[in-house]
Swiss-Prot record:
This is Elongation factor G 1. CDD domains: EF-G (cd01886), EFG_III (cd16262), EFG_mtEFG1_IV (cd01434), EFG_mtEFG_C (cd03713), EFG_mtEFG_II (cd04088). Catalyzes the GTP-dependent ribosomal translocation step during translation elongation. During this step, the ribosome changes from the pre-translocational (PRE) to the post-translocational (POST) state as the newly formed A-site-bound peptidyl-tRNA and P-site-bound deacylated tRNA move to the P and E sites, respectively. Catalyzes the coordinated movement of the two tRNA molecules, the mRNA and conformational changes in the ribosome. The gene is fusA1. It comes from the Bacteria. It comes from Aliivibrio fischeri (strain ATCC 700601 / ES114) (Vibrio fischeri). One of its GO terms (cellular component) is cytoplasm. GTP binds at residues 17-24, 88-92, 142-145. Keywords: Cytoplasm, Elongation factor, GTP-binding, Nucleotide-binding, Protein biosynthesis. It is found in: Cytoplasm. Pfam families: EFG_C, EFG_III, EFG_IV, GTP_EFTU, GTP_EFTU_D2. InterPro entries: EFG_II, EFG_III, EFG_III/V, EFG_IV, EFG_V, EFG_V-like, EFTu-like_2, G_TR_CS.
Length: 698
């Protein structure tokens, strides 16, 4: 079967933003203008098409990244059909994991900001994630009809707070209730969208006289940015020659793809103005799969290989999300990087080292699905019927095995105990938690060995609320929930050499395992690093992985208070064995014993999650807010001026001190202040707090 749309006309984009910037409404409008949804769904009516879980519609926030495929020919039907695969990403900070894994598989992004509140803490998080994956992006400043909306102020914040180089390609005409359209700075015309048909048609008109001067000034800025794309254009510009519209667009595209500039547009999705031009900008300025560097991976022999966006290369895809669908079971969302795969084909999961067969392949429009026979390089689709695939796994051709870069997922910071209400709920709860954990790598389930309780941990209170809510709705499991607990961790600060010897002699065959380990801190965030320095066969090859396994299992229970241990490097440098008595089990136990002994000698410490907190407050209450943060062991990192005389206080505060903060902030500031919080890093706790934690766990 031939390809319907050439890959050069594909755009895989994400729509990212912080909670209230109007991202879902923007996506809804995109679906409306591209002809996919005939009635515009409003978020505040709980009817948006992309938000397809019940909890999303109730809370008016997007939790899971729904993927959808649409086609666009341009506002003026000036292009051939382009296929746009859109991933709508959540804006709430507890779900940054969803954003992270979406950005991993996208080629470009549209970042939506609110015209009045501008760059908010969550926007910074999303921006940093997009920087990490080198995703080219354009900006849509939405809600220009809102009180306090100011396009150029937001552009300024993008420059100063995010360290980007924004280049406006539009200006707003009027703001707040007077917002009536935009000036296109490339064409130097006013765009007037027709309100009678919800903005489906438009006209170009002359720029209003009172805006002529401002438009000239920003047009100059835009041409200058374009000229910097090449020496040739710069010479032309400096000699006073006019750059043609095609030259300007080509130059802006080049610089956007190189992540040198970020083009800025504006509008109001709710008022049906501006989204149409954003779609044009996606086609003109964001990359096709062939415009981004080839994805790197490693083959079976650990050699680095690349996969190019080409149907003739071997098949390779990344599973970036697992979702449970009430009708078909498990859906595996994947981004195909190279090659072609048909329904019924056998493929290889190179991370799990297992074969899988594609039962059916569907392309989704929010939660409606359309079956397809095959998918090709550049496609985003979902496969039904894969047995054992986790987020981040690579699916590839059995004859050209490759592991694409793995995704990194954050450590959970908050933990609660859940217990089923009835015996019947007990079994169902196990199944439900297993499925939810497969969908979401930032959510973990474990059993407390001493109390036998089931503990679930995640990225924040809202994250766990939604998990409990989904157990009830999707799996009919009723459960009682304990008080949230902080997910402490342990690590070591010193270095030591230790011996672990396990000997058991009880008639017949005994057990014998003997190891010498050097235990030391690994690089921050490196996790567990195991180094094998055995020479001369002091420990036989076949037992070495057992030693590592023994250490790793022991790391689940730290020596101080039984919390998991982070960032340790263990070097196995000596040991001994007996031909008859040695076994994998004996060496596993020896490794575990040595680690336990070594961790006690290597200055063990307890770590606690430190949160990045931003409080926005009227100036009158600033002293109270700062005083309260200091009392909560917070470190004030800086203060900024917000909009409308508000102050923004940035601090790092231990999570353990932040429970109930929302209520206390409300009462301290008569409900005028708001805050946002996200995980920053693990920090060492002081001795007296460590003693208290150890005593509580006693």
């Amino acid at each position: 079967m031939a390809r319907n749309t050439p890959i050069e006309r594909y755009r895989n984009i994400g729509i990212c933003a912080h909670v209230d910037a109007g991202k879902t409404t923007t996506t809804e409008r995109i679906l409306f203008y591209t002809g996919l949804s005939h009635k515009i769904g409003e978020v505040h009516d709980g009817a948006a098409t992309m938000d397809w879980m019940e909890q999303e519609q109730e809370r008016g926030i997007t939790i899971t990244s729904a993927a959808t495929t649409t086609f666009w020919r341009g506002m003026d039907a000036q292009f051939q059909d382009h296929r746009i695969n859109i991933i709508d990403t959540p804006g709430h900070v507890d779900f940054t994991i969803e954003v992270e894994r979406s950005l991993r598989v996208l080629d470009g992004a549209v970042v939506v900001f609110c015209g009045s509140s501008g760059v908010e803490p969550q926007s910074e998080t999303v921006w940093r994630q997009a920087d990490k994956y080198g995703v080219p992006r354009i900006v849509f400043v939405n809600k220009m009809d809102r009180a306090g909306a100011d396009f150029l102020r937001v552009v300024d914040q993008i420059k100063n707070r995010l360290g980007a180089t924004p280049v406006p390609i539009q200006l707003n005409i009027g703001a707040e209730e007077d917002f009536s359209g935009v000036v296109d700075l490339i064409k130097m015309k006013r765009i007037n969208w027709n309100e009678a048909d919800q903005g489906m048609t438009f006209t170009y008109e002359e720029i209003p006289a009172d805006m002529q001067e401002l438009a000239e000034e920003w047009r100059q800025n835009l041409v200058e940015a374009a000229a910097e794309a090449s020496e040739e254009l710069m010479d032309k510009y400096l000699e006073g020659e006019e750059l043609s519209e095609a030259e300007i667009k080509e130059a802006l595209r080049t610089r956007t793809l190189n992540n040198e500039i970020v083009l800025a547009t504006c509008g109001s999705a709710f008022k049906n103005k501006g989204v149409q031009a954003v779609l044009d900008a996606v086609i003109e300025f964001l990359p096709a799969p062939v415009d981004v560097p080839a994805i790197k991976g490693v083959d079976e022999n650990d050699n680095e290989v690349e996969r190019h966006a080409d149907d003739n290369e071997p098949f390779a895809a990344l599973a970036f999300k697992i979702a449970t669908d009430p009708f078909v079971g498990s859906l595996t969302f994947m981004r195909v990087y190279s090659g072609v795969v048909n329904t019924g084909d056998a493929v290889y999961n190179s991370v799990k080292q297992k074969r899988e067969r594609f039962g059916r392949i569907v392309q989704l429009h929010a939660n409606k699905r359309e079956e397809v026979k095959e998918v090709r390089a550049g496609d985003i689709a979902a496969a039904i019927g894969l047995k054992d695939v986790t987020t981040g796994d690579t699916l590839c051709d059995q004859n050209a095995k490759v592991i694409l870069e793995r995704m990194e997922f954050p450590e959970p910071v908050i933990q609660i105990a859940v217990e089923p209400r009835t015996q019947a709920d007990q079994e169902k709860m196990g199944i439900a938690l297993g499925k939810l954990a497969a969908e979401d790598p930032s959510f973990r389930v474990e059993t407390d060995e001493e109390s036998g309780q089931t503990l679930i941990s995640g990225m924040g209170e809202l994250h766990l609320d939604i998990i409990v809510d989904r157990m009830k709705r999707e799996f009919s499991v009723e459960c009682n929930v304990g008080k949230p607990q902080v997910a402490y961790r342990e690590t070591i600060r010193g270095t030591t050499e230790v011996e672990g010897k396990f000997v058991r002699q009880s008639g017949g065959r005994g057990q014998y395992g003997h190891v010498w380990l050097k235990i030391e801190p690994s690089e921050p965030d490196a996790g567990f690093v195991f180094v094998d320095e055995i020479v001369g066969g002091a420990v036989p090859r076949e037992y070495i992985s057992s030693v590592a396994k023994g250490i790793e299992e022991q790391m689940h229970n730290g020596v101080l208070a039984g919390y998991p241990v982070l960032d340790v490097k263990a070097t196995l440098f000596d040991g001994s064995y007996l031909d008859v008595d040695s076994s994998e089990m004996a060496f596993k136990i020896a490794g575990s014993m040595a680690f336990k002994k070594g961790a006690l000698e290597a200055q063990p410490v307890i770590l606690e999650p430190m949160m990045k907190v931003e409080v926005t407050t009227p100036e009158d209450w600033m002293g109270d807010v700062v005083g309260d943060l200091n009392r909560r062991r917070g470190m004030i990192e800086g203060m900024d001026d917000g909009v409308a005389g508000l102050k923004i206080i940035r601090a790092q505060v231990p999570l353990s001190e932040m429970f109930g903060y929302a209520t206390s902030l409300r009462s301290a500031t008569q409900g005028r202040a708001s805050y946002s919080m996200e995980f920053a890093e693990y920090g060492e706790v002081s001795k007296n707090i460590a003693d208290r934690i150890i005593a509580e766990r006693g």
